[in-house]
Amino acid sequence: MTFSVDKVRADFPVLSREVNGLPLAYLDSAASAQKPGQVIDTEAEFYRHGYAAVHRGIHTLSAQATEKMENVRKQASLFINARSAEELVFVRGTTEGINLVANSWGNSNVRAGDNIIISQMEHHANIVPWQMLCARVGAELRVIPLNPDGTLQLETLPTLFDEKTRLLAITHVSNVLGTENPLAEMITLAHQHGAKVLVDGAQAVMHHLVDVQALDCDFYVFSGHKLYGPTGIGILYVKEALLQEMPPWEGGGSMIATVSLSEGTTWTKAPWRFEAGTPNTGGIIGLGAALEYVSALGLNNIAEYEQNLMHYALSQLESVPDLTLYGPQNRLGVIAFNLGKHHAYDVGSFLDNYGIAVRTGHHCAMPLMAYYNVPAMCRASLAMYNTHEEVDRLVTGLQRIHRLLG
């Protein structure tokens, strides 16, 4: 099918509103994407006419809600090409998924003297859980350093591995720089050293196809809200053999087989033993609608459109005086920048006055900010509903700010 950005934009109600008397240019989808009417309506319809608690309910509404929820698990498994739907755990988002791995697999497999490898470009969600695990067990956290162009110093990676390396935890795409890491070679190297690999896919799954079997990663995690779905829902993929060995990290209803005050508790099988309590069923069903929406458009079509838009944006931004861009020329989704010596908050505030929404701050990547010796950056992110005209408005806005502030 031919990708039509105008038709896509018509599906997103919020894109028709104004901000400060001007049409909204929403360039903040890397933080959280807007939702198409199809997602909003599907979740609302569930709450209006189909809501019930899932699992163990004998009545019709409960059985139907359970079936819908489990169908989304199957749908998500196809979306990332997992071998089985039972390799997928519903989580609140990428952060919870990584914490689940750290507290379940990590507590069982990482010991004093072991080490975990991350990179200098990671989001805090892929740093802090590993820092906490290492502190608990006496393990070492090793870091792949950055190059100035926003790529990793991959030549250092072989020197970081040894017989005590248990995990490589790496982002698929940097949320600040847009760098897409060469996962295939990194995963192969990790497996050659007997280490497992966790991939933070929060900034990847909306931009192009992801095939977890082809990647051969052990864990892959992403959030629904960045994929045009609801907040509070995400997916953790774990290879089946690993998942079956992992102990639960939260206790409660739905994750048990038996509970006895005298004989203790036994767990149900994976993935359900990692889904304690009442799930976010509405969010899960909304995620299913988002997956259906994106799949119907075609991720290859989306990728082609977004890459053309990114190339246009980078070329047009060259006309802005005193603009510093961070990250490689070949990138996905995001453009981080600073304008002269002006603080990112000031630049972002001016852009907001022009109806342009960008993200400002450290972007949950303070080690990366420290590497570039800046307290903050502005970040414009480009999604499938953004346009060349919105890029032009961003460029014009930055030129105007430069004239005003010098």
From Swiss-Prot:
UniProt cofactor(s): pyridoxal 5'-phosphate
Primary location: cytoplasm
Protein's UniProt keywords contain Lyase: yes
Coiled-coil segments: none
Catalytic activity of the protein: (sulfur carrier)-H + L-cysteine = (sulfur carrier)-SH + L-alanine; L-selenocysteine + AH2 = hydrogenselenide + L-alanine + A + H(+)
Function: Cysteine desulfurases mobilize the sulfur from L-cysteine to yield L-alanine, an essential step in sulfur metabolism for biosynthesis of a variety of sulfur-containing biomolecules. Component of the suf operon, which is activated and required under specific conditions such as oxidative stress and iron limitation. Acts as a potent selenocysteine lyase in vitro, that mobilizes selenium from L-selenocysteine. Selenocysteine lyase activity is however unsure in vivo.
Name of the protein in question: Cysteine desulfurase
Species, as recorded: Escherichia coli (strain ATCC 8739 / DSM 1576 / NBRC 3972 / NCIMB 8545 / WDCM 00012 / Crooks)
Upper lineage: Bacteria, Pseudomonadati, Pseudomonadota, Gammaproteobacteria, Enterobacterales
